[in-house]
A protein has these predicted regions:
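Feature activates predominantly on carbohydrate-active enzymes
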Residues: 10-14
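Active-site beta->alpha loop and helix N-cap motifs at the rims of alpha/beta catalytic domains
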Residues: 16, 20-110
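General structural signal for secondary-structure boundaries
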Residues: 1-2, 67
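Short catalytic helix/loop segments, enriched in acidic residues and glycine
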Residues: 2-9
């Protein structure tokens, strides 16, 4: 669904494109019937603008807390799919909740 506008994004010369959040993964699969990882990779091939994501605490996939290994895998998959910038925040300012996925993304090139 986003691929038809990829050329417009490329021509707009944005500084960065915010790509994905947990709810977008759910909506992409449940309502649009698309593979969100495939969509990121296809857009990465068409758009040279840096991609970024903002993750909320240790809730990478939804609004429930995820185990550390899931958050680390999430960071790895984001980087391998073409995400260059990963930001994270925690509503309680408990940054231990954000460190695993950030370190994983950094280790894999984001």
């Amino acid at each position: 669904m986003m691929l038809p506008v990829a050329d417009a994004f490329e021509q707009a010369n944005f500084w960065v494109v915010e790509m994905i959040g947990a709810v977008q993964f759910d909506a992409c699969m449940r309502f649009i019937g698309e593979n969100p990882w495939h969509r990121i990779r296809e857009l990465r091939r068409r758009i040279s603008t840096p991609f970024q994501v903002i993750m909320r605490s240790n809730c990478a996939l939804n609004f429930d807390r995820q185990p550390v290994d899931i958050n680390e895998l999430w960071g790895e998959l984001l980087a391998k799919s073409g995400i260059e910038r990963v930001y994270a925040f925690d509503g309680l300012h408990d940054y231990d909740n954000t460190i695993p996925q950030l370190l994983s993304a950094k280790a894999h090139g984001a």
